[in-house]
């Protein structure tokens, strides 16, 4: 179910404060965050945010196309290694 329009998009306060400081200082630093639920705002464009995937921080460079999406969409939590080959062939 989608979020109500009257509420507006969600961003964690600590992440928004960090990004506002970066924009004001005009620096290009990597910002570490655990907030996968935060929505990407237009102010984030051009910055790199390291999003936690449960094991490590994955650097995500924010582009125009990402605005409105959640940070967690760009840091997958599960790694698919493919199905294992059948062992019957190797035993012979």
From Swiss-Prot:
S-S bonds: none
Domain of life: Bacteria
A single BP term in Gene Ontology: ribosomal small subunit assembly
Entry-linked Gene3D superfamilies: 30s Ribosomal Protein S19, Chain A
Pfam hit, one: Ribosomal_S19
Molecular function as annotated in GO: rRNA binding; structural constituent of ribosome
Keywords linked to the UniProt accession: Ribonucleoprotein, Ribosomal protein, RNA-binding, rRNA-binding
GO cellular component: cytoplasm; small ribosomal subunit
InterPro entries, alphabetized: Ribosomal_uS19 (IPR002222), Ribosomal_uS19_bac-type (IPR005732), Ribosomal_uS19_CS (IPR020934), Ribosomal_uS19_SF (IPR023575)
Record keyword Endoplasmic reticulum present: no
Function: Protein S19 forms a complex with S13 that binds strongly to the 16S ribosomal RNA.
Similarity section: Belongs to the universal ribosomal protein uS19 family.
NCBIfam families (alphabetical): rpsS_bact
The protein's name: Small ribosomal subunit protein uS19
Source taxonomy: Bacteria, Bacillati, Bacillota, Bacilli, Bacillales
